Amino acid sequence: MPSIEAVGAREILDSRGNPTVEVEVVLEDGTLGRAAVPSGASTGAFEAVELRDGEDRYGGKGVRKAVAAVIERIGPAIIELEATEQRLLDQTLIDLDGTPGKSALGANALLGVSLAVAKAAAAASGLPLFRYLGGPSAHLLPVPMLNILNGGAHADTNVDIQEFMIAPIGASSFSESLRWGAEVYHALKSVLKARGLGTGVGDEGGFAPSLPTNRDALDLIAEAVDKVGLRLGSDVALALDVASTEFYADGSYTFEGSTRTAEELSDYYAELVGAYPIVSIEDPLAEDDWSGWVALTERLGTKVQLVGDDLFVTNPERLARGIASKAANALLVKVNQIGTLTETLDAVNLAHRNGYRAMMSHRSGETEDTTIADLAVAVDCGQIKTGAPARSERVAKYNQLLRIEEELDDAARFAGAAAFPRHGQPA
């Protein structure tokens, strides 16, 4: 396998118009690998650190320091390493940074290099990325968790819950599930217009109307599902990303205009799960509310998927704590939360070995990079959330999954309802 010959980086823009890092790695045979790094809006306190410039340009969000770190510090340290030695490469990056949160060189610098090398190695091997990372058994297409209605930090409205998603679990293939999702998305726009509600979209492409309550959002989606002739529950299930850390302070939650304890908020979720076909709730409680998470998981963990995003931040150490204390039953996977591909794969493997599901995820600040689509198939996630079926930085990932399904042909298998605890064992 060719070794790394050159490493470059540049500042590009993400989908919110903020700078991010793009890295290019060239191998000695001329093979190129390119990767762009995403960025979140609602970020966990325990995520690896993005390196930003803090200067006047771009409101302090420039990434020239991270770009310089790639070119001046990381590049010279990895030249001549074999591109297939991913674990060695990533450990070299971690050691070079030398801080627990990757704050010296920046997780955005490290991740760009880590992913670009993997993509170069796949290309040099003559393999698609999903096959290079996942081996010959990688064939499971994930259920798309389509964020069609936005609130919280992703939209400037009075809706507390950050994401209302649909999961087309009854489809026979990924392509059919994506079609169903797109049809419901367009139907929802019609429903909103008919009621005189706004059809502007949030960061991830979902509509962002002002609504009296969070239940109103679920009812509107249910109407849209019915409008296209699909059955709520068996064809299309519902999912939430509450992002509750955003409204948590001093041990309580400010939700729908009132202050609630973890137990009271758990009562609310129990009511929702009883009233609607909800298969997944992400970050129902805050990243520091471990006791609340344990109690909620004991209460609802056999009925609905409880996903740790801010709780785990794709970090094997935090995930291990969750497994030991029986907090949550699924891991949200965001490559930029931890900063290297190897650590991401380790987190997913730890989750799967302990009976936790894993959901691959984008960030609200995205690019046209499609790495997470391949990664979802490579690690048998069975679930992916990468926004609405709108905005090209979201659709790029879904389109890549269509290509992968086509390439797999008869070997492709769609995760479907079995991906969620409410509908049986994992696929």
Curated annotation (Swiss-Prot):
Cofactor or coenzyme needed: Mg(2+)
GO biological process: glycolytic process
EC number: 4.2.1.11
Location relative to the cell: Cytoplasm; Secreted; Cell surface
Record's catalysed reaction(s): (2R)-2-phosphoglycerate = phosphoenolpyruvate + H2O
Keyword Calcium in record: no
Catalytic residues in the record: 204, 334
Pfam families for this protein: Enolase_C, Enolase_N
The keyword Secreted appears for this protein: yes
Keywords assigned by UniProt, alphabetized: Cytoplasm, Glycolysis, Lyase, Magnesium, Metal-binding, Secreted
Coiled coil stretches, renumbered: none
Disulfide bonds: none
Name of protein: Enolase
Species for this entry: Frankia alni (strain DSM 45986 / CECT 9034 / ACN14a)
